[in-house]
Amino acid sequence: MDNPMLLKSTTRHVRIFAGEIDRDGDLVPSQQVLTLDIDPDNEFNWNEDALQKVYRKFDELVEASSGADLTDYNLRRVGSDLEHYLRSLLQLGEISYNLSARVTNYSMGVPQVAIDDKQVS
């Protein structure tokens, strides 16, 4: 095939492409390599541990899909599962909203504020 179609999954915070970046910075379609772009709009504050958890979850989801055809549907399912995983990291406090982001829209829910039970009203 001269011009293979690029398969991709795009959610608010996760982009997965069936392809790889070449030396010129172009995305080249591939049936063998997946490229993951996490939080492309920098909506969250990340630390290395949280990023590694996402990469491990991605690897786990891809491994669970091994043997299945590489289709838009299967790629979207992995992307959707990763999006839910990011929500769980946010709810656990392992990542937080980036209040300096270009747009603050709280797409995964309004931040929760801890209330100190010892405070007197």
From Swiss-Prot:
GO molecular function: oxidoreductase activity, acting on NAD(P)H, quinone or similar compound as acceptor; quinone binding
InterPro entries, alphabetized: NdhM (IPR018922)
Keyword Transport: yes
GO cellular component: plasma membrane-derived thylakoid membrane
UniProt entry tagged with the keyword NAD: yes
Keyword set, alphabetical order: Membrane, NAD, NADP, Plastoquinone, Quinone, Thylakoid, Translocase, Transport
EC number: 7.1.1.-
Domain of life: Bacteria
PANTHER family to which the protein is assigned, alphabetical: NAD(P)H-QUINONE OXIDOREDUCTASE SUBUNIT M, CHLOROPLASTIC
Function according to Swiss-Prot or TrEMBL: NDH-1 shuttles electrons from an unknown electron donor, via FMN and iron-sulfur (Fe-S) centers, to quinones in the respiratory and/or the photosynthetic chain. The immediate electron acceptor for the enzyme in this species is believed to be plastoquinone. Couples the redox reaction to proton translocation, and thus conserves the redox energy in a proton gradient. Cyanobacterial NDH-1 also plays a role in inorganic carbon-concentration.
Subunit-structure text: NDH-1 can be composed of about 15 different subunits; different subcomplexes with different compositions have been identified which probably have different functions.
Entry protein name: NAD(P)H-quinone oxidoreductase subunit M
Organism the protein comes from: Nostoc punctiforme (strain ATCC 29133 / PCC 73102)
Gene: ndhM
